[in-house]
């Protein structure tokens, strides 16, 4: 059986058309299927629509989280409740066409543990977003010990072995595509063209993307801490030679003129480096603090899934 996890946040406008498209593609496969909606604190009527859809089809389930926990945690909740031996992660905004699932399932049948969808074309995305996304993936692959495929999102199919391994990763700052890459196992790609949204506006603002990028970097790399250390060594190196130059100018050249400019430049430069280092360390400490609290990753407000079905 394949479980299809759909994270939902304010998708009322385009959800019905996406579900129709998904249902059509499911009729073309021999796999038994369950569809799991994860309502991540939607402020529109998404939950009402989800409940109506679930009433009309016994294979459609829903999880209503107690508040908005974020896309990555919503997907994690869906994985936790999924019963299938294969789990497909896909957004419901229509940008990732459900028809690609047939190619992905064919690859799974070849023995792969993970099949991820790799974009060869992105519709309705600005040049800035495409450029920053490409730069980010290349940068992330440079500073981490794992390789996260470029031009991929969370659209993929994983098997039960991978899903169970993900459940053993308790960190609160989730970056699923990085976590799945870290797990290893046998992975491959299927190429596809990403479409424009079928309705509404994206919930992934630049602020949320920056937060996701920070989670990715701090979860898989110590590079920011090393940068702070190297900056400290660099400043100490420069400071040492400035001291030597000051002594040389004062006692050898007799050209030493006391003044505020050099002092202020030095203070501002060193202060900026110190604040940068403190900020980087603070990001890691904040994440340690979140994890040692040992709070649940999410809370379920209501669901039509049998509690015994989840792990």
Placement of each model-derived feature along the sequence:
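Acceptor/aglycone-binding surface of glycosyltransferases and processive sugar-polymer synthases
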Residues: 63-67, 71-81, 95-179, 195-214
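Short conserved micro-motifs on helix faces and helix-strand junctions that flank
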Residues: 7, 65-67, 90, 156, ...
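Structured catalytic core of nucleotide-sugar glycosyltransferases
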Residues: 1-126
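Hydrophobic helical membrane-anchoring modules
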Residues: 138, 175-311
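Generic structural signal for secondary-structure transition and capping sites
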Residues: 24-27, 87, 113, 144, ...
């Amino acid at each position: 059986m394949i479980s299809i996890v759909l994270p939902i946040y304010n998708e009322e406008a385009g959800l019905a058309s996406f579900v129709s498209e998904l249902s059509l593609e499911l009729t073309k496969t021999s796999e038994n299927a369950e569809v799991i909606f994860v309502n991540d604190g939607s402020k529109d009527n998404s939950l009402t629509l989800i409940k109506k859809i679930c009433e009309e089809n016994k294979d459609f389930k829903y999880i209503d989280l107690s508040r908005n926990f974020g896309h990555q945690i919503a997907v994690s909740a869906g994985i936790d409740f999924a019963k299938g031996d294969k789990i497909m992660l896909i957004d419901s905004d229509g940008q990732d066409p459900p028809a690609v699932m047939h190619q992905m399932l064919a690859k799974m049948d070849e023995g792969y543990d993970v099949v991820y969808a790799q974009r060869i074309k992105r519709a309705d995305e600005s040049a800035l977003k495409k450029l920053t996304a490409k730069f980010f993936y290349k940068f992330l692959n440079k500073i981490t010990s794992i390789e996260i495929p470029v031009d991929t999102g969370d659209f993929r199919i994983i098997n039960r072995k991978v899903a169970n391994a993900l459940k053993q990763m308790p960190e609160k700052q989730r970056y699923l595509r990085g976590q799945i890459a870290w797990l290893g196992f046998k992975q491959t790609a299927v190429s596809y063209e990403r479409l424009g949204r079928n309705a509404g506006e994206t919930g992934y603002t630049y602020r949320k993307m920056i937060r996701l990028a920070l989670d990715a970097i701090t979860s898989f790399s110590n590079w920011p801490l090393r940068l702070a250390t190297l900056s400290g060594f660099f400043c100490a190196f420069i400071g040492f030679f400035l001291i030597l130059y000051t002594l040389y100018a004062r006692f050898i050249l007799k050209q030493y003129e006391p003044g505020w400019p050099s002092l202020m430049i030095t203070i501002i430069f060193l202060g900026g480096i110190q604040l940068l280092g403190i900020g980087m360390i603070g990001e890691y400490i904040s994440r340690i603090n979140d994890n040692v609290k040992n709070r649940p990753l999410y809370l379920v407000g209501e669901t039509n899934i049998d509690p015994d079905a989840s792990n």
